[in-house]
Amino acid sequence: MNGTPLWYRFIPFLGRLSELTKRQWKLLRTLTVVLLLTGCASGSGQAENELPSTTPITQPTDGEWPVSTHYDGKRFYNTSGADKGAGDISKFFWQNLWNKEKWPKGIANPPADPIVDRVTEGIRATYINHATVLVQVAGLNILTDPVWSKRVSPVTFAGPKRVRDPGIPIEALPEIDLILVSHNHYDHLDTTSLKKLRQQQEKEPVIVSGLGNAELLRKQGYLNAVELDWGESTQVGMATVHFVECQHRSGRGAFDQMKTLWGSFVVETPEGAIYFAGDTGYSPHFKVQGEQYGPFALSLLPIGAYKPRWFMKDIHLNPEEAVQAHLDLNSQQSLGIHFGVFQLTWEAIDSPIADLEAALDARGLPTETFWVLEPGESERRLSYQWQSTSRLVE
């Protein structure tokens, strides 16, 4: 920099430090602890009974995977090339001190809808919280990205803290047959919840995730954890589970960034195909998957954690992009997830719903085609008509 001393470059930074409020200093200390532990990764016995019928259609070699379009022998990549470096991640966390909208400390949930043990006709979806949904179809109980912890963080004293309780206590769940884990970020792979869920289940559920995640899942008691590459599948009861491409990243610490595979799920059932996106940015993969597996009876699409766009666009949909994904997938109905529970990014707590309504209106789509639920509320689809106990959150 033309002979400019290195220390001189930090003067603007030091000036901003002097402006910090007591609350911002506390937040800075918290962020520092979490970043040191995670490496900026935010966003980063014998089974007692037989498993349900589970036959991998294609079985990867555990821990040894061939080089591919998204794996170079050491790390996984997005095929689009979208990625953010450590500098961008650090910049995002620093700017969080000044740019995050204020969220309420807590929001009470309305009374939950009654939980049924099994559903043999149609599809019943119960929103629990964040990306956790109980999907009941064809006699199977499916749980996505189970999270019941108070914080989504490597430590219990720092990191994003929930402002809404799960809509269903973990103890109140029916018997779970299949768990889908989209990737290993703390707000999607919650080891405390997974361990408790395993302990209370008489039979070991089938748990499916991307390459590299099985070892961690087995430590939580899922000895028969299945890990899949993009395009691979496994059979669970009357459902075929496909692990498919999405645009995101992985990592739980400083030394495992992009070492495990992230992805979305397609679950083909006699009642129709179901799509669970997990976490993803928008890319052509939605159109490809819509053509390959669609139409979808139900899609679970993230609508929150999307600001600022310069950082989040590659890895998180905003509501407008979620509506486009809904159309690309040829989804008859979509449920918005991943919002209003943990403050991960800058937008206000009610922005995802308002922006979703605006995006639907701009496309001339009724809210009945892409809706949201309160934690604990359920929707049931029979044939092509929806019988709803829910309402769009106002």
Predicted segments with their positions:
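Active-site metal-binding motif and surrounding structural segment of the metallo-beta-lactamase
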Residues: V67, F157-V208, N224, G294-L300
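Bacterial N-terminal signal peptides that target proteins for export
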Residues: L6, L17-L28
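Metallo-beta-lactamase
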Residues: L35, A41-K161, P166-A172, G210-F276, D355-E377, L382-S383, ...
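A short acidic, amphipathic alpha-helical/loop segment
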Residues: T192-L197, Q220-G221, H285-Q289
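Cap/insert and terminal regions of metallo-dependent hydrolase folds
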Residues: A41-S42, T55, D62-G63, Y71-Y77, ...
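Acidic/histidine-rich helix-loop elements
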Residues: W148-D165, R249-D256, K307-H316, Q343
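Catalytic core of the metallo-beta-lactamase
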Residues: T132-Q136, Q235-F296, K313, L317-E321
